């Protein structure tokens, strides 16, 4: 049996744009993609801290400092909103006990301020 666990999270990134006319996705700063370990076209869930919206899309490379929601997802955000961007992975129960997701914290300019592995002490 597999279980779905958090793989990586970018915590409280600032939305820099919303482009309704783009075909879809979230454009993410290359530095944040690298720090978090996200992959191009990887599915992500996005949680808007300002309005409570929760939705899924996929990752594309953006410009430095950019977090831009594109296509239909643009309806769920406004410039300046804070969002949490998460990806998940399917693991066996044994793998889940050892798994430590990556969490990336950013400032208001979407620059990495801290990167850490989440503690797995409760997964015994």
UniProtKB/Swiss-Prot annotation:
Group of enzyme by EC: lyase
Subunit relationships: Heterooctamer of four alpha and four beta subunits.
Family affiliation: Belongs to the PanD family.
Name assigned to this protein: Aspartate 1-decarboxylase
Chief place of localization: cytoplasm
Stored Pfam families: Asp_decarbox
Entry GO terms, CC: cytosol
Modified residues (Pyruvic acid (Ser)): 25
Gene Ontology annotations of biological process type: alanine biosynthetic process; pantothenate biosynthetic process
Origin species: Bdellovibrio bacteriovorus (strain ATCC 15356 / DSM 50701 / NCIMB 9529 / HD100)
């Amino acid at each position: 049996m597999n279980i779905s666990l958090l793989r990586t999270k970018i915590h409280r990134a600032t939305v820099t744009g919303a482009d309704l006319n783009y075909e879809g996705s979230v454009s993410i700063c290359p530095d944040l993609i690298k720090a978090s370990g996200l992959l191009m076209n990887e599915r992500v869930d996005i949680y808007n801290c300002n309005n409570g919206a929760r939705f899924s899309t996929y990752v594309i490379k953006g410009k430095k400092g950019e977090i831009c929601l594109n296509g239909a997802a643009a309806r769920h955000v406004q410039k300046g909103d804070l969002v949490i961007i998460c990806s998940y992975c399917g693991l066996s129960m044994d793998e889940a006990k050892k798994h430590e997701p990556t969490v990336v914290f950013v400032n208001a300019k979407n620059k990495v301020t801290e990167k850490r592995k989440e503690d797995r002490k409760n997964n015994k």
